Amino acid sequence: GHKVKDKTMAEQLWKGRFSKAVDSRVNDFNSSIRFDQRMIAQDMRGSGVHAAMLAKQGIISEKDCEDILSGLASIADDLASGALTIDPNAEDVHTFVEQTLTARIGDAGKRLHTGRSRNDQVALDIRLTLRDYSHTLQAYIVELVKVICRKAAENTTAVMPGYTHLQRAQPITFGHALMAYAWMLLRDLQRFEDATARMDAQCPLGSGALAGTTYPLDRQFTAEKLGFAAPCPNSLDGVSDRDFCIELANAISICM
């Protein structure tokens, strides 16, 4: 397997402004790898599409693009097999991927970030990750509703007391009680679908740090390839918006 040297990744990002070694506590404070390593698959998915767009637009060569895509695939394979592990000393998952990629394919790896900022990259990664989580949760809800409906159908004549204000009020069936939860969960499902649809409406990639880039990017291409309806119309909104996170958290809290 391929190895990436420890202790260097986080330091390389910060050493340029300092004459002495950066204190480990500073690196630890600035590091987000423990949180954002869960986004590594989505980060590489976005990078692959970004590389394809750069080659399509003539910003990087086809050879660079091929090397980048094969390098990303090899990283994914080695992570899956255990031949490669995420460096806990890396500042973030994006740095880990880029430096691992460059170690494997050379200078082509350095050209991957052309026309892209950490800001639009992170905004994209979060959307892709939450979309995947939302789809997983939606599938779980659908399966749970199916089980509830099946059990309710088996208990259409099983009588039980219905309560109001902690007092027995009216006789109902166990099936009727179960179906109340099925209907609640179906509303939860709609909330997840609605939040995800809004998340998928606009792709932030290409927004740059906050005001785009002078590179001739094809934002429609990347938006479509990544499953978005369109590029976000305002670059500042694209990189600063996090209301989709709150919306999904709201749907989760109601479901719980």
Where are these regions (language model features)?
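Short, Lys/Arg-enriched N-terminal segments with co-localized hydrophobic residues
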Residues: 1-8
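A helix-coil-helix interface module used to build multimeric assemblies
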Residues: 8-208, 216-225
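Short linear loop/turn motifs
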Residues: 67-70, 236-241
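Glycine-rich anion/phosphate-binding loop at the beta-strand->alpha-helix junction
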Residues: 188, 192, 238-256
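FAD-binding core of flavoproteins
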Residues: 211
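Solvent-exposed alpha-helices and their adjacent loops that cap or buttress functional pockets
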Residues: 214-215, 240
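Active-site-adjacent "gating/activation" loops or surface patches in catalytic cores
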Residues: 219-239
